[in-house]
Amino acid sequence: MADDEPRNVKELLVAAKDASELLIDLAYAAVLFDDEDLAHEVEILEERMDGYLRRLRTLAILAARSPEDAEGIESVLWIAGAIDQIGDAASDIARVVEAKLGIPHQLRADLRHADEVAGRVKVREGALVGGRSLRNLSLPTETGMWLLAIRRGRDWEFDPGPDSVVSEGDVLVYQGPEEGMNLIREMAGAPPLPPSPESGGPPLSELDRAVDILVEMKNAAEVAVGLAYSSLMFNDRALAAEVEMLETRSDFLHDELESWVLRAAAEARNPDDLRGLLRIAAASESICDAARDITWYVEHGERPHPVIQMALEETEETGAETVVETGSQAEGHSLRQLRLQTETGMFVLAVQRGRRWVYRPRGRFSLQAGDRIVAIGPEAGAKELDALCRAARPEAGPN
């Protein structure tokens, strides 16, 4: 076993959890780019994650020496099963590209305007990022973008760490807010992206509706996973209840999508293009189901094994929650004005206002005193977000 390979239950759980979230991002990116090489890499990463989970299950079973131990270990195996289901679903999404099942061009256009967009850019000669480490570049806080992967020739580096160095000619695969796309392209020495052109010809209304539903299912799946892990880390039943709502919504959307796809088939130029929609929808629903499973212990008021909490605190993206205080910098300002993602690197999963939740609020969403923010991102960004939401404290005068 390599020195940097995870060795114990906690390390294996961290590696599997991080891999599951990366798999979701890469799978949808493979669909967006219609990239068979990237889809194949998703398959390889999923196999690696399966290896982590097999070792985790073996070590967890060996650690149970009493009925009390077994009850605690059961929660570890339960979470491992949910993570495994997420990986399987992501792999199913990638296989749509590998199997050439067909993806309508409307879907790729809509994915470019999803809550989080993916993109790729080649590093030009003399670019600002050339020869610099990711730690030095601080891309999440400077642009709001996370690097999913770096491709150098035919080699891929997934989920690159802070010591990874970007070189001229590298292809960066990134994800984040739409307003950050041209920021990272500028740093890579690439020209800005032009506004998306209007699609030619009158679109099929039934197909457009099916595509819109699928993009909503994608957004729901990504939010559900983030909220599920956050509910587990904070032992928060309110977050678990929101995951349940998202899972129920996903079931409804899946039924709706199947109906619209069947209606679109009669007018579609190539009905085979609709097969990919059905496969991606089923996989997206499966991700929501797995997210619901992750929240089971929180939902039922039972404490999972402490190693799960320890693992969640050590993952690459940290969960954070904070409340907007009266007189804070955040109060009365929109997310766009605060530039939360580009300034702090934190992605807002949800905002709770009273008893109502707003998932993945848009840039125009204005924060009010008392709003509870649930976000994910780098540890340094979590501290910056908290500072924005705290009212200035008067300095203590001399005694």
Give short role names for the model-derived ranges.
Residues 1-399:
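Cytosolic, long alpha-helical scaffolding segments
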